[in-house]
Amino acid sequence: QLKKEVTRLSKVLHRDITQSRQHFLKLTLPETYRNLIDLDITDDYTMGFASQIGFRASICTPFNFYDLDTELETKLKIHPFAMMEGTLKYNMKVNPEDAMKKIQPLIDEVKKVDGGFMSLWHNDTLNNRKIWLGWKTVYENMVQYASPDKN
C-alpha cells in the first residue's frame, strides 16, 4: 500500500518522493523505517512523541537510522522533533497563554548543545479560528525565541 501511495504521489507531483512523516506519528520500529528505505525515502520526520513533549530519540540533531537487527547504519536520515502543538493543547491541556512556558525550556536545552529545534505544527493551527485562537501567536513567539540571535 505504501509503495502504491508513494508512486502515485510521485506521478502527480512529477518528482521523486524522498521525505516522509507518518500520519498520527504511527511508527513501528524497525519495520516502518525498513519500508521507507525500500522505497528510497531518504528523510523521515516522524520521530517524536504524540502524547508528551520532549526528545523521543534523546537527541536534537538528525541522525541516520541504525538497524539493530542487521547491525547496519542506513542512509535514512531521522529528523527528531521535540514538540507538537496538538500535544500541548489536547494531551497536556495547555492554553496559548501558557504554551511558551513549556516550549522555552525545550529550546533552551537545544541551544545548550548547539542542536536543532524542530517542532510539528499543522497548517490549520495557524488559521486563528476559534478552536486554535491564539496559537498562531505562540508559533510566532516560538520562532522568535528559537532564532539564533536569542539567548
Give each language-model segment a name:
Residues 1, 7-110:
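Active-site-adjacent pocket scaffolds in enzyme catalytic domains
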Residues 10, 97-151:
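C-terminal domain-boundary segment and adjacent tail
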Residues 4, 31-34, 130-137:
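Generic recognition of short, well-ordered alpha-helical segments
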